[in-house]
Amino acid sequence: MSRYVIERNLPEGLSDGDVDAAVRRTVAVNADLPTVTWIGSHLATDHRKFFCIYEAPGPEVIRKAARLAEIPCDVVTEVRPVDPESYADSQL
């Protein structure tokens, strides 16, 4: 499985209730798509953008999940994890 960052541009004036409803739809859709794993997301404080981390066999299944959940899927970028633990034993 590959890992992806998804950038979702959200409409202005989105409420917390709107965000909660979108998250519930996403969870329901992903339950029916076993090849898609939602790792987590970060919501911009102005509620205008979501940055989501997914594992999937390819970007097309991520876009399909977004369509089914009726949420935006503006940019899908394949990434590789880089974290502090990966470098804990290295010499600086």
Q: Which residues does each predicted region cover?
A:
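Short S/T/G/P-rich N-terminal loop/turn motif that feeds into the first structured element of a domain
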Residues: 1-32, 44, 81-92
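Short, well-ordered beta-strand segments in beta-rich or mixed alpha/beta enzyme
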Residues: 4-8, 39-65
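Generic helix-packing signal
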Residues: 26, 30, 34, 56, ...
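A short linear hydrophobic-aromatic micro-motif
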Residues: 35-41, 75
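Short amphipathic alpha-helical patches
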Residues: 50-53, 74-76, 85-92
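An amphipathic, aromatic/His-enriched active-site/gating alpha helix that lines ligand/cofactor pockets
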Residues: 56-82
